[in-house]
């Protein structure tokens, strides 16, 4: 039987290390959440993208998400709201509806008005912390900078990593780049909102919040 050379052993060691690192990265990118009980309520919170501007109320992503996951989904979208305003409003909605799960999609109006990205990041982080401090599980929807064909800022992923929560970095960016899924330059149409709802439901399943 031929002897295994030091070079081969070294290569095997590198391959093993690479495999381990990939597994660790995979685990890090897939946060785990507690399964939602049947009576659990979901709060979708944000601005006009959550409200459903550009489509009928029953075609908004919260309405479509409710049909997909068989949980009550409260639409907490307020058109025109900045992240600073959302931070002030969130506590009221958490107190009133007592959700077990929060889908947070905020920052669009900060970007449209060229407000501070650092302040938007601070506000989104504060909203996530507020929910987590109350025992509410959270998922982030990353918002791209409209009209610039640029991906969402890195702070969404950084906040998700800090709090070990899921984040969808692609769905809204993908919808906005496809004119067939848009009602105007900023808001999706019914098809676009439907795709958002499906992506969110799948992400909730992947995290363990929903049964597959």
Per-region residue spans from a language model:
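C-terminal motif of bacterial Sec signal peptides marking the signal peptidase cleavage site
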Residues: 23-26
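Alpha-helical cap/lid subdomain in secreted, periplasmic
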Residues: 68, 88-212
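Bacterial N-terminal signal peptides that target proteins for export
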Residues: 2-15
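Serine-esterase "nucleophile elbow" of acetyl-processing enzymes
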Residues: 28-82, 89-98
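Acidic-and-aromatic substrate-binding clefts and catalytic sites of carbohydrate-active enzymes
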Residues: 52-56, 81-84, 114-115, 146-149
């Amino acid at each position: 039987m031929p002897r295994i050379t030091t070079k081969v052993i070294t290569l095997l060691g590198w391959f093993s290390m690479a495999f381990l690192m990939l597994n660790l990265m995979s685990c890090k990118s897939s946060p785990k959440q507690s399964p939602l009980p049947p009576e659990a309520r979901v709060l979708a919170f944000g601005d006009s993208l959550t409200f459903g501007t550009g489509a009928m109320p029953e075609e908004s992503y919260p309405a479509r998400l409710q049909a997909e996951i068989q949980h009550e989904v409260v639409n907490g979208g307020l058109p025109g709201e900045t992240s600073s305003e959302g931070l002030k409003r969130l506590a009221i909605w958490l107190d009133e509806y007592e959700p077990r799960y929060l889908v947070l999609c905020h920052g669009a109006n900060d970007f449209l008005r060229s407000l501070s990205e650092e302040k938007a990041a601070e506000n989104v982080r504060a909203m996530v912390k507020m929910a987590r401090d109350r025992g509410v599980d959270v998922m982030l929807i990353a918002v791209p900078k409209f009209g610039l064909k640029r991906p969402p800022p890195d702070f969404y992923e950084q906040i998700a990593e800090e709090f070990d929560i899921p984040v969808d970095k692609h769905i809204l960016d993908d919808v906005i780049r496809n004119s067939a899924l848009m009602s105007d330059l900023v808001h999706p149409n019914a098809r676009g909102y439907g795709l958002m709802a499906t992506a969110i439901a799948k992400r909730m399943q992947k995290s363990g919040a929903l049964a597959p």
